């Protein structure tokens, strides 16, 4: 049975740890789908350290945008995080919010057609007030609308 869970909060608020704990409550063999773009060797080492710290029971997947490329049917999967996932589309579409949002929604719908338990982790970046930076305001809008869309599908 498909299930969508959305975990949101501020930066460093414990969202990922909470999501991992929730996944462990639901299965002994969870999937961790990380959406971060690996920019350099230092970050690659950080990713490897996080994978090792999660333990051997986890299936680790690195995927910047096309989550639906991965068959997670029948699994419990933590998607961490929506903010970085949106960033990847935002950069691909040259900061065009409408195009980015359309692509994110399309990929979300395609990915979540699978019969799985999806635990999406996202940041609430809009609580910090309105930025003076136009690019940041555009991204905050994209993030907020994406969070609303995922929340509308969540159980």
Task: Label the predicted regions.
Residues 56-102:
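Helix-adjacent hinge/juxtasegments
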Residues 1-4, 11, 73, 98-102, ...:
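Catalytic phosphate/metal-binding cores of nucleic-acid and nucleotide-processing enzymes, i.e., regions
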Residues 37-40, 83-84, 124-127:
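Conserved nucleotide-binding/hydrolysis micro-motifs of P-loop NTPases
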Residues 4-71:
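Conserved P-loop
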Residues 19, 50, 78, 123, ...:
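Residue-level signal for inorganic ion chemistry
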